């Protein structure tokens, strides 16, 4: 597999290299960055991707792919036969269990998947390389600014220039700090932890989400525990929590995982952990996601669903959007990208963040969970929210409920923030 190419031009002055040029520079080789590179390179752009990790690195994740993510993989023509197919979601709230298939007849496929990130990321970045993108591993790239405009990057002692630079480096790092693309301080964020274990139920075709978690003090946790069967003899087991919960600063993720493990160990016949549990932070906002000469995509743009911590699908979609726009007109891409993302995602994600302030109160969380799975109709709406299937274009009952909720919570936003747990 080729991971370097000669697609980037080398501008020279005499015998000394001055700068390398390309049509598009991408900081980060995860799903979002790879999606941008695939789409742009197939469209004829000269693309260079930088990642500070080595090829084949793992990424801490739940490994679940929603039908929305599958639709994006289909659009990118990335095969996923090796992934474990998932038909729906099992939601558990106290003694209530509901098993629901992913909706059919929508603009998304009727199935999802579980695909460990090491293999998913490799398939995507290999696709970018095959399309002609140059991939530079173990190379940290930092934006180069001319005034307030990003004109390229410095990486590995060299400099590249391009009409557009895409920030796809996940949770904020040095590049995000330089561009002011960090998390908004008073907005919610999430923490999650996961590991793997062997299970005879590894081939189940449903994701399982336990919505009624409690910390070691018995306080309800706004978040969920998950069992994601990988189809390879193992399951991904983890828990996630929102920063809006009462007592969040004292939350012990390892203890929360052990508590959840105790709930599911028998029903899933779990073996010992196959690796040490690993935790990560889930950004759910960004101070900036575009500026002259640059855009941020995926996690770097805060595109994570507060209701489930999922963002792979949003990363793939935002990467495709950015690539299509830069192929059309790099000069106007940042502003058009921001409008496109706002139209598609901002309403739903802002509503999710506001809702997270509500469910940070234990009594509201308990009441809300009873409602969320109380009837088939409400459970189906919950399924679509948990599956990232709701956005500004969603039709039908789920769309109407979302838009009504959006209006109410937008009006109540100041009160929600003042009265947070």
What are these model-derived regions, one by one?
Residues 17-32:
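Beta1/beta-strand and adjacent pyrophosphate-binding region of the FAD-binding site
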Residues 25, 38-61:
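Glycine-rich FAD pyrophosphate-binding loop
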Residues 32, 55, 172:
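Conserved Rossmann-like nucleotide-cofactor binding loop
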Residues 43, 127-267:
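Predominantly flavin-linked oxidoreductase catalytic cores and closely associated redox partners
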Residues 53-76:
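Conserved N-terminal glycine-rich FAD pyrophosphate-binding loop of Rossmann-like flavoproteins
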Residues 70-123:
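A conserved beta-strand/loop capping segment in the N-terminal third of enzymes
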Residues 243-326, 331:
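FAD/FMN-dependent oxidoreductases across multiple families
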Residues 324-421:
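C-terminal helical "tail/cap" subdomain of flavin- and related membrane-associated enzymes
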């Amino acid at each position: 597999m080729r991971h370097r190419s000669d697609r980037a031009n080398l501008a020279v002055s005499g015998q000394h290299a001055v700068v390398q040029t390309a049509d598009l520079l991408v900081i980060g080789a995860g799903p979002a960055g790879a999606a941008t590179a695939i789409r742009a390179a197939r469209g004829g752009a000269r693309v260079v991707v930088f990642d500070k990790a080595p090829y084949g690195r793992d990424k801490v994740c739940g490994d679940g792919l929603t039908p929305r993510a599958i639709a994006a993989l289909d659009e990118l023509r990335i095969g996923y036969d090796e992934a474990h197919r998932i038909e729906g979601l099992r939601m558990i709230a106290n003694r209530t269990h509901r098993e629901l298939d992913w909706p059919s007849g929508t603009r998304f496929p009727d199935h999802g998947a579980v695909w460990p990130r090491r293999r998913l990321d490799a398939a995507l970045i290999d696709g970018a390389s095959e399309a002609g993108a140059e991939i530079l591993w173990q190379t940290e790239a930092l934006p180069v600014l001319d005034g307030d405009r990003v004109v390229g990057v410095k990486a590995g002692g060299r400099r590249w220039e391009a009409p557009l630079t895409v920030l796809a480096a996940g949770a904020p790092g040095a590049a995000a700090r330089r561009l002011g693309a960090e998390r908004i301080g008073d907005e919610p964020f999430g923490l999650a932890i996961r590991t793997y274990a062997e299970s005879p139920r590894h081939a189940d075709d449903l994701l399982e989400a336990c919505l009624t978690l409690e910390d070691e003090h018995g306080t309800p946790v706004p978040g969920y525990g998950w069992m994601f069967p990988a189809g390879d003899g193992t399951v991904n087991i983890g828990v996630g929590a929102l920063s809006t919960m009462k007592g969040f600063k004292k939350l012990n993720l390892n203890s929360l995982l052990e508590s959840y493990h105790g709930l599911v160990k028998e029903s899933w016949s779990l073996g010992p952990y196959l690796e040490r549990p690993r935790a990560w932070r889930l950004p759910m906002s960004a101070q900036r996601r575009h500026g002259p000469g640059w855009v941020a995509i995926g996690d770097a743009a805060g595109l994570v669903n507060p209701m489930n911590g999922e963002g792979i699908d949003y990363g793939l979609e935002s990467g495709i959007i950015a690539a299509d726009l830069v192929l059309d007109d790099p000069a106007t891409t940042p502003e058009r990208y921001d409008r496109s993302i706002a139209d598609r995602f901002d309403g739903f994600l802002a509503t999710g963040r506001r809702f997270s302030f509500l469910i940070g109160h234990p009594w509201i969380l308990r009441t809300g969970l009873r409602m969320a799975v109380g009837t088939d109709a409400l459970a189906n709406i919950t399924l679509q929210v948990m599956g990232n299937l709701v956005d500004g274009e969603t039709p039908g009952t789920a769309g109407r409920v979302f838009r009504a909720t959006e209006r109410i919570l937008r009006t109540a936003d100041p009160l929600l923030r003042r009265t947070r747990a």
